[in-house]
Amino acid sequence: MELWFSDYHTDKVKMSVKVEKQLFGEQTDFQRIDVFDSKEFGRFISSDGSIVFSEKDEFVYDEMIVHVPMAVHPNVRHVLVIGGGDGGVARELSYYKEIEEIDVVEPDEVFVEVCKKFFPDNARGLDDPRVRVFYADGLRFLRSKNDQYDLIINDAIDPLGHTAGLFTKEFYGNCYRALKEDGIMVYQHGSPFYDEDEDTCRAMHRKASHSFPISRVYQAHIPTCASGYWLFWFLSK
């Protein structure tokens, strides 16, 4: 019997991947986590039924969200990653020897442990001695931070469920205060391809632009993300 995993992009569109077997499944305090093995994408992990990343294309996401701001900012020393429990963003940041401190704030400890077990190439980023992992809510974590970071990367999954607070006006305002004068914030902006998702992207843009005077969008093709067309938002003071 064939086993397929389907990620529903809308109620009329889905992406299905033939899987060899399921490697893990558990409901945590924050989300439903499943790990599958497939021939086409290798191992992939899902959260509440939606693919988070796969071994085959995770590099596109992690490289785009890290190396673009690093290419622009000449003096990044202190970095905050909101989410990022898989370690992929920390891995890409670890290539920059000038970075002194990488704080990763991830609410779900189970997610981190699952990624360490099944996605070691990502999770090795968390082993860098400059990385500090805080198991906390990103919104609350930021409330006490002022003028501390050169770069903030919001690696949260999407503006739903336990990550909804990371796409609010309060969150963007807290990020603005936590950044130094020449600081940069980057976050995954989702896909505007489907009508409902386009509305979500516009709403996120309005909230972020309320705090940051400089805002730009860049894009990448990531096959396992909804529609494959993925945006990233670049914000600066």
What does each of the following model-derived ranges do?
Residues 1-44:
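N-terminal auxiliary segments of SAM/dcSAM-dependent transferases
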Residues 2, 53-187, 194-201:
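The AdoMet/dcAdoMet-binding core of the Class I SAM-like
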Residues 43-48, 154-156:
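Gly-rich Lys/Arg/Thr-decorated short loops/hinges at beta-loop-alpha junctions or inter-strand turns
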Residues 30, 182, 229-230:
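Active-site lining segments that contact anionic ligands and/or coordinate catalytic metals
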Residues 6, 44, 184, 232-234:
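Ordered hydrophobic segments in well-structured contexts
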